[in-house]
């Protein structure tokens, strides 16, 4: 009799779910999290040209976080300009869209940081011989999204390295626009997150070549409402869980982001 009871207890223990991460009551009730995304930044988030479905590192990370939390991720496509207003007004619970954690944004949102990243110069491969090192960029036209922190970082780098011959910054509507202007010869070089370049170089073989290394350290974060402390902690716990069980590293490797991973989740590490 005792042996049978013990066996039953062991089976029940084996089948019991892992300790659940505590969710805010409203999230626990609706069993979903509304997440804003701007799918135009491969490999972070984009629409698969063959299927028109959302894909990318952020999409797969978001779905993995949802499984850890036991909720559905309800993706809400929007423009970049509307992401912060959406989190402020509560139209979405989170933003997971390759967003840089900046101190200037932390009054509006709290960031759970999941990548260590930074801007990197690149040029057309056909002009690689002109740009053997980054100092060759001095005096040249360099394009980057005006909505990011890249303009500030480019100006800082130029001030330090281009005495009397500064980079001529050209603001673009986004990274895709910067690449278009690069191909058209309207800019000599472009800047975007270094984590995105390996994917782009695979997507368009022979098109681009990086110049130098990442020239500033940034963190990419999942943005949440400043007052949503319980959800912030839940996301931290879920991300740490993915890091611990190896799922996070698997996703990094799949999307060629291994060199940009973090060892643990942090909050508002951006400057």
Residue ranges and their predicted role:
Residues 21-23, 149-169, 210, 240-271:
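Ligand-binding clefts/hinges and TM-proximal coupling segments of bilobed small-molecule sensing domains
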Residues 30-55:
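Short glycine-rich His-centered loop
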Residues 39, 116-123, 201-240, 257-271:
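Periplasmic-binding protein-like
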Residues 47-48, 63-69, 150-171, 201-205:
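Ligand-binding cleft/hinge of the Venus flytrap
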Residues 59, 75-85, 129-130, 168-180, ...:
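Short helix-initiation/N-cap motifs at beta->coil->alpha
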Residues 59-68, 127-128, 135-149, 221-260:
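Extended ligand-binding regions for polar small-molecule ligands
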Residues 63, 67, 72-136:
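Acidic, polar ligand-binding/catalytic clefts
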Residues 81-85, 98-106, 153-156, 181-183, ...:
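A ligand-binding cleft/hinge motif common to bilobed small-molecule-binding domains
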